[in-house]
Amino acid sequence: CALPICARTAHFTEMVRPYWGANTRRSLVQLLTSALPFFALWYAMLRSLEVGYWLTLLLAVPAAAFLMRLFMIQHDCGHGSFFHSRAARDGVGFCIGVLTLVPYDYWRRTHAYHHAHSGNLDFRGFGDIDTLTVREYKALGRWGQIGYRAYRHPLVLFLIGPAFHFLVKHRYPWDIP
């Protein structure tokens, strides 16, 4: 694109302006079309135990998808974009947090901090994946480098890390800003 950065930014801003702010009607539709199927699947899973665990596990797949959709609504509540009312956002976010096992207020504050400082090497160590500069990496000893490389391995980043984050860190928020 040959446009200067400020012109591209202005163009982008105008392009997304219609999507700014909350639309209460649309938000309620999204909430209902996420929560009702989730609870229906939850009930069906409970009833399916009489048939067999295989059916319960099969129903768990779409239930997990609807739970993920509910987490996305919780995310939008945390960003202040789902309802105009702060009380409505916080109420819905809290209730969904009970279902997703993600404490809403803690997550909202730490996620806002993450967005404010993500990618800024002067504000590392909270809400992000630890990142070292080349100079910092080279200054580590052999075991430090091995540990850092193990930490950055996809198995750790995408399996062990999220499990630790959701099962431990959300239960013991010792590093909340």
Please report, for each region that a protein language model flagged, where it lies by residue:
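Short glycine/serine/threonine-biased micro-segments
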Residues: 62, 76, 95
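Short amphipathic alpha-helical segments, especially helix-boundary/capping motifs
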Residues: 15-20, 51, 68-73, 85-89
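Non-catalytic, topology-defining segments of multipass membrane proteins
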Residues: 2-64, 99-109, 117-177
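Post-HEXXH active-site segment of zinc metalloproteases
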Residues: 84-98, 126-131
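Acidic (Asp/Glu-rich) catalytic motifs at the cytosolic membrane interface
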Residues: 67-86, 107-119
